[in-house]
Amino acid sequence: MEKQIFEHSVNVEEEHYQPKQEFHNMEAKLDEALDGELLDAQLEQALKPKSSFRKTLLKFTALLFGLATVAQSVQWIWDSYQQHQWIYLAFALVSLIIILLGIKEIICEWRRLVRLKKREQLQQQSQQIWLESAVKNGDVFSVHNAEKSKILCLDIAKSLGLENDSPAVIQWQHQLNEAYSAQEIAHLFSRHVLSSFDAQAKKLISKMAAESAVIVAISPLAVVDMFFIAWRNLRLMNKIAEIYGIELGYFSRIRLLRMVLVNIAFAGATEVAQDIGMDWLSQDVTAKLSTRIAQGIGVGLLTARLGVKAMELCRPLAFQLNEKPKLSYIQQELLSSVKDIVLGKNKIYKKEQI
């Protein structure tokens, strides 16, 4: 047997490297936003006050008109008194009183807007403090930002009508530590001080959303639903603002009116679609009942969405991660409320037919 010699050959495969790619003046295509994100962005854009030269000119013109009206009323009173025209004098006095009452309401409205602006500034300050604390070294907490966060939280407590010796504030102060960052201080403040206000707002949102859903589900008239949703949404905004110590005026309500109109349009459009669809498909009671339940839940969720947005705007301390209320906790309650009311009504209706 002959000896076989095997030669060890090393096969070196050539590696092919992809050359580098260079991009010059390339356009980046952004991902499309979700529907919910678009609604939030549109709402926030609608709520932001738009300052322009026309608005400044309009304010200046209104001020001149008010001063001229007051001066004309005073001149009218003086001329009527000099000429002994008592009827004209009475009209002039009434006009002056009405003008003064209007000026008083304008001043009160301006004060409400100032309070709302201060609340927005508190939110912006809290966000700025958290941003500065996050940008700095994560291991070494900034003492300056921590002190600013404490002062901001105390200012927020005063805006809510809470003194430094209130039980919630004292409990929050006992939980503080020198090693805590600005975000941790604000989180403790939210948990010990703002939690009671947040609980009231969440309970109110759930209650009014469920009521709106039930009424829309059992009401056969679209016009009634539209006016009912408008009234309930305005009342919801007022109550949430009252919980957080804000008195909404005319112009501050206008800033949230677009979301209310969305709810009104949804209630009216879905009810009209329901009527047309049921007439076209069939007169089946079960199908109509299912459509009404879905419609009521949809309106209830939109009402809850409005309440959460109003809560986010009226809350003095901006929400941190995982603090903002979600609509998931309202869905089950809405479903159970609408099913109990509507299905109970359907059983009574069937018994009457029998």
Curated annotation (Swiss-Prot):
Keywords: Cell inner membrane, Cell membrane, Membrane, Transmembrane, Transmembrane helix. Pfam families: DUF697. The chain crosses the membrane at residues 57-77, 87-107, 211-231. This is UPF0283 membrane protein CGSHiGG_02710. It is found in: Cell inner membrane. It is a multi-pass membrane protein. One of its GO terms (cellular component) is plasma membrane. InterPro entries: DUF697 (IPR021147), UPF0283 (IPR006507). The lineage of its organism: Bacteria, Pseudomonadati, Pseudomonadota, Gammaproteobacteria, Pasteurellales. Belongs to the UPF0283 family. NCBIfam families: hyp_HI0043.
